[in-house]
């Protein structure tokens, strides 16, 4: 939604990422697929959107939107797929288009944190395949490539992904995506949520995000983006002090977008 991305840049967000793009149009999962819930006493959102997208061909004309590029801030394109070949095909289509544009601050985010392969597994379950895919991306593009992983990944899985990325130039890791929970555990039923479970976002994810940032920073010199559960200046400051290069927000933009200028003000006065 260009209008929302524009408004968030107006209030001071430092960069944006388009939602995940697939090769072909997809409606995603059946509705109802997003609900406000309480988790551990905190406000949260549970979604089972299922990566709705208009497909890469319909997305390409929208990338270079002057309302967004005029801020001259980084713009990310999140890429998904139902197979490795689809990931690469989408990447190649977008890279060919970006090469003819005059805006230079595009980057890629590779969404490996959903079950996006033919056998129903996450791409992160096959690390050799992941490594091969990112190396293929690097052969045709010099842009920054960020790999977005799930907070449900084990510490060992996260560190193995970091090992791969640490040997490929201009890469970073994004911790992370939403956390899978069953719908009935947060008071939902099949009448108000179409799937058995979904991805939880909100402040209750923060402590695990902080823990994983510290884990990565103590083992690898790799750029880290921390996005799970960030909801205040104190969160941002603690993550940056713990080794994150950047922080990202999603649910906060829904619940209290005016935290953005407050966070920026506090950071500028540190």
Annotate each PLM feature.
Residues 1-75, 263:
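N-terminal capping/small domains of soluble enzymes
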Residues 1-10, 89-94, 153-167, 217-220, ...:
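Catalytic cores of alpha/beta
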Residues 15-23, 107, 112-114, 172-179, ...:
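Glycine-rich phosphate-binding active-site loops on the catalytic face of alpha/beta enzymes
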Residues 15-17, 72-80, 105-109, 144-148, ...:
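Structural preference for beta-strand elements that scaffold enzyme active sites
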Residues 25-42, 182-198, 240, 246, ...:
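C-terminal helical cap(s) of enzyme catalytic domains, especially alpha/beta-barrels
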Residues 44, 53-72, 125-147, 193-224, ...:
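Alpha-helix-loop-beta-strand connector modules within alpha/beta enzyme cores
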Residues 91-141, 146-151, 164:
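Metal-dependent enolase-superfamily TIM-barrel catalytic cores that perform enediolate-based chemistry
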Residues 112-125, 158-218, 222, 258-265:
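Glycine/Thr-rich beta-alpha phosphate-binding loop at enzyme active sites
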């Amino acid at each position: 939604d260009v209008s929302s991305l524009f408004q968030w840049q107006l209030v001071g967000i430092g960069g944006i990422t388009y939602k995940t793009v697939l090769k072909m149009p997809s409606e995603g999962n059946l509705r109802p697929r997003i609900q406000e819930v309480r988790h551990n006493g905190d406000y949260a959102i549970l979604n089972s959107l299922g990566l709705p997208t208009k497909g890469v061909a319909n997305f390409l004309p929208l990338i270079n939107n002057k309302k967004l590029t005029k801020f001259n801030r980084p713009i990310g394109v999140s890429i998904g797929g139902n197979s490795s070949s689809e990931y690469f095909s989408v990447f190649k289509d977008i890279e060919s288009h970006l090469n003819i544009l005059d805006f230079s601050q595009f980057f890629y985010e590779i969404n490996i944190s959903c079950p996006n392969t033919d056998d129903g597994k996450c791409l992160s379950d096959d690390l050799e395949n992941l490594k091969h895919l990112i190396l293929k991306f690097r052969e045709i593009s010099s842009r920054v490539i960020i790999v977005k992983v799930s907070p449900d990944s084990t510490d060992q899985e996260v560190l193995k992904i970091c090992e791969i990325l640490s040997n490929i130039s201009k890469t970073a890791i994004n911790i992370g995506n939403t956390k899978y929970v069953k719908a009935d555990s947060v008071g939902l039923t099949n009448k108000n949520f179409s799937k058995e479970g979904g991805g939880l976002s909100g402040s209750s994810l923060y402590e695990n995000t902080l823990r994983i940032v510290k884990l990565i920073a103590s083992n690898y010199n790799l750029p880290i983006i921390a996005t799970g559960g960030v909801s205040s200046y104190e969160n941002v400051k603690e993550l940056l002090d713990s080794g994150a290069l950047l922080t990202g927000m999603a649910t906060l933009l829904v619940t209290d977008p005016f935290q953005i200028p407050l966070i920026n003000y506090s950071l500028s006065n540190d």
